[in-house]
Amino acid sequence: MARDYYEILGVSRSADKEELKRAYRRLARKYHPDVNKEPGSEERFKEINRAYEILSDPEMKARFDRFGEAGVSGGAASGFSTDFSDSFADIFESFFSGFGGAGTQGRRRTGPVRGDDLRLDLNLEFIEAIFGGDKELTIKHLETCGTCNGSGAKPGTKPQTCSTCGGTGQVRRATRTPFSSFTQVSVCPSCNGSGQIIEEKCVDCGGRGQKEATKKIKITIPGGVDNGTRLRVSNEGDAGRMGGPPGDLYVFLSVKNHPEFQRDGINIISQIKISYLQAILGCCLEINTVDGKTELTIPSGTQPNAILTLEDKGVPRLGNSVSRGAHLITIEIDIPTKITPEEKELLEKLAKIKGERTGKGGIEGFLGSWFQQK
């Protein structure tokens, strides 16, 4: 089954380089085999690496966008041909050992940390997606604890610098072999990499500095959204740590089907059925549109499956609500299987006027095979 690398990373096809990197970092932390021991986490981790490997390379990304997985199946190995150094430095520093002299050895882990982004899936009614509007959402996210202001320490106290690691969040162990020596770096077991020790924890948050909260927010859905549209709500993700900024909330939209209308880009599509007499003579009918009832003129001589167009009755163009698509109506012509004697008599007269042959079975010309007397 073909894989969608955008879906694996949980981003849209319009995601920029920074969005891809943030999504990759978040997922890599979550599914790294040294952290996540659940079955399937290692395969998921490999999938995430592969997706970022392709989408972070402009050439490979362009090939994937055009041809799908087939366009990149031979273009990169399953290793890391793309430069992951920046991402790995942040993500894996606490998982892998490093050698003496490496640039990450003295890095402190106690600086501000941005909060995680959150995802919310929202299912819209067909008409809501076309015209947009305000929606009230209930979200759950982490907020900075108001009692300790995010420090995790009991009010009146403050975190202390970890004496084991000196506040770096890392410990080093020198190892000698018959051939060389190197320094192994790992997460400080005393402070778990934070560089700080909380001796008296805040009773409200248990020392975490954050509390889960339920919140109602109002967002505006722009007109013209469709399945897969992603809306970003700034600063409504999880709160940051150690004074870091909050993450963002991403709302992924899906649209319910409509019993009468279909959508093709910015055009609305529907079907109506008319009688053969209406098709021949023409008529004016009231039909449904997304704007409500409107009149549609059926020209005389309309053929089966003809498409009539109502301009500016379609979907507003996303980002430019003044510009709208069209409503395309496919005409289906209802041919009766039985007719009354009076109808038959009139049709036979019409057939004679048109020069059609009639016989024992009725009209033998164009209309003959369509009708039977009741």
From Swiss-Prot:
Q: How is the cofactor bound?
A: Binds 2 Zn(2+) ions per monomer.
Stretches annotated zinc finger (CR-type): 132-214
Q: Which residues form a coiled coil?
A: none
Q: Where are the CXXCXGXG motif repeats?
A: 145-152, 162-169, 188-195, 202-209
What UniProt keywords are attached to this protein's entry?
Chaperone, Cytoplasm, DNA replication, Metal-binding, Repeat, Stress response, Zinc, Zinc-finger
Q: Read off the PANTHER family from this record.
A: CHAPERONE PROTEIN DNAJ A6, CHLOROPLASTIC, DNAJ HOMOLOG 1, MITOCHONDRIAL-RELATED
Q: What does this protein do?
A: Participates actively in the response to hyperosmotic and heat shock by preventing the aggregation of stress-denatured proteins and by disaggregating proteins, also in an autonomous, DnaK-independent fashion. Unfolded proteins bind initially to DnaJ; upon interaction with the DnaJ-bound protein, DnaK hydrolyzes its bound ATP, resulting in the formation of a stable complex. GrpE releases ADP from DnaK; ATP binding to DnaK triggers the release of the substrate protein, thus completing the reaction cycle.
The cross-references to NCBIfam families, in alphabetical order and at most eight, read:
DnaJ_bact (TIGR02349), PRK10767.1 (NF008035), PRK14293.1 (NF010886)
Protein name, entry field? Chaperone protein DnaJ
Which organism is the protein's source? Trichodesmium erythraeum (strain IMS101)
Source lineage: Bacteria, Bacillati, Cyanobacteriota, Cyanophyceae, Oscillatoriophycideae
